[in-house]
Amino acid sequence: MIKFKNLGLLEILVFLSVLYVVVMLIWTTLTREGVLEKVNSIKLNHKNVVELLNNEINKCSQSPEIKTSWGENCDSTWSSTLIVEHVLKNIELKNPYSIKTPLIQTASDPRIQAEGKAGQSTDKGVIFVSSTDFASEAGSEWIVGTCVKSPCVAAGNNELVSIYR
């Protein structure tokens, strides 16, 4: 039997450190599934928005005289605000983090918002799209970015896609 009164400060510190590591490993194991579920929901939201835009681009490249699903002419510049409003009204976005703000928003630079650079605070689960309108010229770029888990700047913790017309 170990006599606790004979344990020194170093032994107690080692014991507490080992205990802390074991508790953290157990906690990580128990919560991993919930985190993965949230991450997958956010990635699905991101994918649905990107697919909507790509489908509209493909539809409009085949028939430039028709209108987009949000009501703009295919051959004109597309309003980022109208696209965001259309997504909010017509695509079911899952909200795993109970975010109070809209799940898709415009940002001057979605990369900064999705990666959390330059001290920007980011919202996990929010899809950020370029606030500049999507120009009608061939090769015009529009960026869609999402932070899926903290820290957003870490590899694999964000989704960034450039969409071209």
Sequence positions of predicted segments:
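Amphipathic alpha-helical segments typified by the pilin-like N-terminal helix
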Residues: 4-50
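Juxtamembrane non-transmembrane segments of integral membrane proteins
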Residues: 44, 54-57
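Periplasmic/extracellular, small/polar-rich flexible segments of pilin-like filament-forming proteins
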Residues: 58-165
